[in-house]
C-alpha cells in the first residue's frame, strides 16, 4: 500500500484513530519509504491522549487493519526501541 492511498482515506483513518484516543497519527516503514509490496503491512506511529491504554492501541491496530484489508502495526514513540527510534522518527510521515 502506498502513502498516497492512505492519504486519500485520511479522514476515515483519522476518525477511527480519534475514536481510540489517538491525537497524532504518522506512517513509517516501507509505506513511508515507498518500498511497500502487495503483502506489506502498514506501520502507524501514534500518540495517545492521557488515560488510554494498551487495549486502545491493540483495538486501533485491529480496526485499521480491517479497514485497510491488511495488517496494521500500531506503536507509540515511547515504545520504540532506542536503536531504531531516531530512524523511525525521521522517516515518519503525518497522515
Give the ranges of each region predicted by the language model:
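Catalytic core of pol beta-like nucleotidyltransferases
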Residues: 1-24, 32-38, 49-95
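Conserved histidines in hydrophobic membrane contexts and catalytic metal-binding motifs
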Residues: 27
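A short, structured beta-strand/loop element
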Residues: 38-39, 44
Amino acid at each position: 500500500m502506498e502513502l498516497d492511498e492512505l492519504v486519500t482515506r485520511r479522514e476515515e483513518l483519522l476518525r477511527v484513530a480519534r475514536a481510540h484516543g489517538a491525537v497524532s497519527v504518522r506512517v513509517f516503514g516501507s509505506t513511508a519509504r515507498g518500498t511497500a509490496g502487495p503483502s506489506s503491512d502498514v506501520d502507524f506511529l501514534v500518540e495517545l491522549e492521557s488515560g488510554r491504554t494498551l487495549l486502545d492501541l491493540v483495538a486501533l491496530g485491529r480496526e485499521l487493519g480491517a479497514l485497510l484489508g491488511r495488517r496494521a502495526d500500531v506503536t507509540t514513540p515511547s515504545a520504540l526501541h532506542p536503536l531504531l527510534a531516531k530512524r523511525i522518527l525521521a522517516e515518519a510521515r503525518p497522515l
